[in-house]
Swiss-Prot record:
GO terms for cellular component: acetyl-CoA carboxylase complex. Pathway: Lipid metabolism; malonyl-CoA biosynthesis; malonyl-CoA from acetyl-CoA: step 1/1. The keyword Transferase applies. It comes from the Bacteria. Keywords: ATP-binding, Cytoplasm, Fatty acid biosynthesis, Fatty acid metabolism, Lipid biosynthesis, Lipid metabolism, Nucleotide-binding, Transferase. This is Acetyl-coenzyme A carboxylase carboxyl transferase subunit alpha. It is an enzyme of class 2 (transferase). It catalyses: N(6)-carboxybiotinyl-L-lysyl-[protein] + acetyl-CoA = N(6)-biotinyl-L-lysyl-[protein] + malonyl-CoA. The keyword Cytoplasm applies. Signal peptide: none annotated.
Length: 310
């Protein structure tokens, strides 16, 4: 059963009308309603505001990392563990082939349904998750395998145990190591890009965002609570924070925006998967034409240019 957001009420009403017309066997009404549905979809999604895009980024039906991995990766094999503490299910690592190219995918996985959300810790990695990512990234470097990072997290887990095991050090270590990693890297925000939890696997030669994803230093609710002592002002915070793909592209903080199907990735998963796959292959082709030393040099220069203004 489809889930509808508040701004999709008009779409829901027409969907319900179509379902009722089908029950009555009124094919003429169904045809008319489908045309009306197309118009309503175009009107609704033509000019989404920042808060509506935030809701789309968090939509429960939106494809998660494993949806993309299982669809795009051929002969995929999961690699587990940080070899120091434990295997963190919030970070998943796979080796396989995309379009005939061998790659390693390192991704944040939220989990679908109560059981798996708890197992994946709602996509909030512990330090051992980031250390697993670093271990696998070093493996990719050793065998000269490109890395695809898929970012989708509310943020790094802020629990006492995570802090005791060095959460901030694990994130900082990844930022340092990934900036000089001698292999080609592509990072894509597929849903939520929450603060350091996203940055920890977000240092790459290409940083892109799906059209309806977000990337921010803090959640809008957290921002509103700090600035106005009122988390309910999250809509105003969302607008002020410039967290959408288009905003960040304009600010030159990301390289590319990957277009989604008209109604978003949650309504057309196959279309979103196809768009991501095509983007990855295109960027890999471009990066493979360059010497790896030049690739790393360009990556470092890009990182150092962030926040620098003439």
């Amino acid at each position: 059963m489809a889930s509808y957001l508040d701004f999709e009420k008009g779409i829901k009403q027409i969907d319900d009308d179509i379902a009722n017309a089908k029950i009555r066997g009124d094919e003429h009404a169904v045809e008319i309603l489908r045309k009306n549905l197309e118009k309503e979809i175009t009107k609704t999604y033509k000019n989404l505001n920042e808060f509506q895009r935030l809701n789309l980024a968090r939509h429960p039906d939106r494809p998660y990392a494993l949806d993309y991995i299982r669809a795009l990766l051929k002969d995929g094999y999961e690699i587990h563990g940080d070899r120091a503490f434990r295997d963190d299910p919030s970070i998943v690592c796979y080796i396989g082939y995309i379009g005939g190219k061998r790659v390693i995918v390192i991704a944040e996985q939220k989990g679908r349904g109560t059981k798996y959300k708890i197992m994946r810790n709602f996509g909030m990695p512990h330090p051992e998750g980031y250390r697993k990512a670093l271990r696998i990234a070093r493996l990719a470097e050793k065998f000269e395998i490109p890395i695809i990072f898929l970012i989708d997290t509310p943020g790094a887990y802020p629990g006492v145990g995570a802090e005791e095991r060095g959460q901030s050090e694990a994130i900082a270590r990844n930022l340092f190591e990934f900036s000089e990693l001698k292999t080609r890297t592509i990072a894509v925000v597929i849903g939520e890009g929450g603060s350091g939890g996203a940055l920890a696997i977000g240092v790459a030669d290409r940083l892109a965002m799906m059209k309806n994803s977000v990337f921010s230093v803090i959640s809008p609710e957290g921002c509103a609570a700090i600035l106005w002592n009122d988390p309910s002002k999250n809509e105003a915070a969302t607008k002020a924070m410039k967290i959408t793909a288009d905003d960040l592209k304009e600010l030159q903080l990301i390289d590319d925006v990957i277009d989604e199907p008209v109604m978003g990735a949650h309504r057309d998963k196959e279309g979103a998967i196809k768009a991501l796959g095509e983007y990855i292959l295109k960027q890999l082709d471009e990066l493979e034409k360059k010497d790896i030393n030049d690739v790393v040099k360009n990556r470092i220069e890009k990182i150092l240019s962030v926040g620098a203004y003439a």
